[in-house]
């Protein structure tokens, strides 16, 4: 049964005291309930660690890890190593997801027998602007070669890890270089799309990527179009 499938969600968190509560609330309130929420505090110096401990006390699905500041790639590697889910997703600690995101991604992965299920991103700015691609509701299924071409063209497939649901086994040893800062998402996705026999894309935008300075994943590939 679908409800027996466990999804692990990896949340990197670094100095996100202003945003982490709304992020975790949006994950906790997912319509798909069988979640493992792994939050890795990457050496935060604000109140992020205390907030995370508070959430772990009231939500048994939340697992909190504290570590010295190591960078986004290493945080994700630790989360992948800890994950027990059949599928794995990523949410940045200052972002928000709509309540049905993982249920729809999982439904598509099952229906189309896909290794990666993904969707669009809504880019939210603190001055009130919102930008998103398309949002037509269309569904597109890609084989390996077509998926890689679409990823590199960036016309349909966003390079981010955060709008996708991956079969867990794809993710092992998928980081080319943990010292890379810019384009880490794109490079890792290039490896993952090479490993995936089939990917499924639904054109809806439930992932709210909030643009702010000093975000852990504030990479050039996510801003070039704006």
Where are these regions (language model features)?
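Nucleotide-sugar donor-binding/catalytic module of glycosyltransferases
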Residues: 1-226
């Amino acid at each position: 049964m679908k409800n027996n499938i466990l999804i692990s969600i990896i949340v990197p968190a670094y100095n996100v005291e202003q945003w982490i509560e709304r992020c975790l609330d949006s994950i906790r309130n997912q319509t798909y309930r069988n979640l493992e929420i792994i939050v890795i505090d990457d050496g935060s110096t604000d109140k992020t660690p205390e907030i995370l401990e508070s959430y772990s006390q009231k939500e048994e699905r939340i697992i909190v890890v504290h570590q010295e500041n190591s960078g986004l790639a290493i945080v994700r590697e630790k989360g992948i190593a800890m994950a027990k889910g059949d599928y794995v997703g990523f949410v940045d600690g200052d972002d928000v997801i709509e309540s049905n995101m993982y249920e729809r991604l999982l439904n598509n992965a099952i229906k189309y027998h896909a290794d990666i299920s993904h969707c669009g991103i809504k880019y939210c700015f603190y001055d009130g602007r919102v930008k998103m691609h398309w949002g037509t509701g269309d569904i597109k299924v890609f084989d390996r070669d077509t998926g890689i071409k679409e990823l590199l063209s960036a016309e349909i497939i966003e390079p981010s890890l955060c709008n996708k649901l991956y079969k867990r086994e794809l993710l092992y040893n998928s980081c080319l270089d943990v010292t890379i800062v810019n384009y880490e998402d794109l490079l890792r996705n290039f490896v993952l799309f090479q490993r995936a026999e089939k990917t499924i894309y639904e054109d809806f935008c439930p992932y709210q990527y909030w643009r702010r300075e000093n975000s852990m994943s504030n990479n050039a590939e996510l801003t070039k179009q704006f």
